[in-house]
Amino acid sequence: LGFQGINGKGEIIKSGGTVVKNVTGYDLSKLITGSFGTLTILTELSIKVLPKPEMSKTLVIKNPHLKKALDFLGKALSSSTDPSGGVFYPDYFGKNFVLNDLTHDGGLTAIRIEGPINSVDQRLDRLSKELSLLDQELSILDNEQSNIFWSRTKNLDVFKNLKNNLLRIVVPISETLQVIQKLKNYEIKYFIDWGGSLVWATFDKLSTKILNEIRNIVKKHQGYVTLIKVEEDLKASADIFTIDPIRYKISDKIKRSFDPKRIFNPGKMYTGI
């Protein structure tokens, strides 16, 4: 909600406060949040937190193919059942989730519902009907197992022994299917989060040429790529974030305003900034 910090010129700056108001200043807090420590040293923070939900359950749909999974996620997230999470794991990741309430080990789509106990059960029942699911097509993860499942998803457990390259790809949900289909030429393994908009992808071989090709594919579908884990030689030559010329100029001007001598994390986000 707000912060106090010191910029690269040694000036103390403040923004926001302890409550959200419809006044100027909140945009600056959002700017600093996404700056990866390149604009200020933060000395004070005001953060809004939400109470832990009383109950969390997860509807797991068995063995959908990618197109059907995205259809399920799209319908669920636009429904009145108010899901708090939606993810798709292809077949090759299914065996990573051994849970008592999970009755199969193949590909799966998972949709989380949270809130008061009675509300969660009613919304789960309504959602399964809205998606026209049969009992044999689904499993329900109860509170404890639901929390385990989403903790593993958040921590990228399916990639915990990864030795290859890991990319974070964000695209509009309407573009996800086409992007995945085009990236299959690069021996991709992936799972999808954010209800279809976030793709965590690993590639056996990733050169500068292939990375640029992947970025161009994603960019054509209005998305961007972030490097999470890459080999050392590639890390030295490639930018972590996808560079858009217009946004690069804006970022450069912002950097010059906050930190003209480039003291804070130079090159952290973009080469030269």
Summary of predicted features, one role per range:
Residues 11, 134-273:
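Conserved glycine-rich FAD pyrophosphate-binding loop
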Residues 3-162:
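C-terminal substrate-binding/cap subdomain adjacent to the FAD-binding core in PCMH-type
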